[in-house]
Amino acid sequence: MVQPDKIYNNGKNEVEVGHKQARKEEEFEVSRSSSNYKRILIVDDEPDIAISLKIVLESSNDDDSQKIKFDVTSYTDPVEALSDFKPNFYDLLLVDITMPIMNGFELCEKILQLDINVKVCFMTAGEINQKAIRELYPLRTIGGCFIKKPVETDDLIRQLIAELE
């Protein structure tokens, strides 16, 4: 399956998602017992980005050489994501930093109160000053993974696999 080279806010995949999503959920139900599947929760207030990330990650499951496969849930509303969050269900959060109502750090602080073991990767289109961020948010919230948007598909997958290993 062909993957986009980069993830941009282009919105061209919305129609494709419904069909792909149903097929991918069926495939995952069959393979769920396999330990190489990891559950990813994406929260990004840009619907096109959230959908594109989901498509890219789940499409990468078709690569037989990839040792970790992804089961992805995406939200565009951090409050809804928090409300629906299931402790001990997700392996990794992929969260946009800048969102209205609740930023990515605030969301992760609340989620980590529910599930201390979930790993976190932050995304942003802005500059990343990790030292300043760690001073503002000194809790375990700040994981080792910061992803700058737009991101190359292969780089995104590599970073997520590294966090999950």
Segments (PLM) and residue ranges:
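Active-site residues of response regulator receiver
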Residues: D44, D96
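Hydrophobic/aromatic residues positioned on beta-strands within the core alpha/beta folds
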Residues: M123-A125
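Alpha4 helix (beta4-alpha4-beta5 surface) of REC/receiver domains from two-component response regulators
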Residues: E106, E127-K148, D154-R158
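Short amphipathic alpha-helix used as the core "switch/output" element in two-component signaling
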Residues: S83, F105-I116
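Acidic catalytic/metal-coordinating carboxylates
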Residues: T76-D77, N103-L107
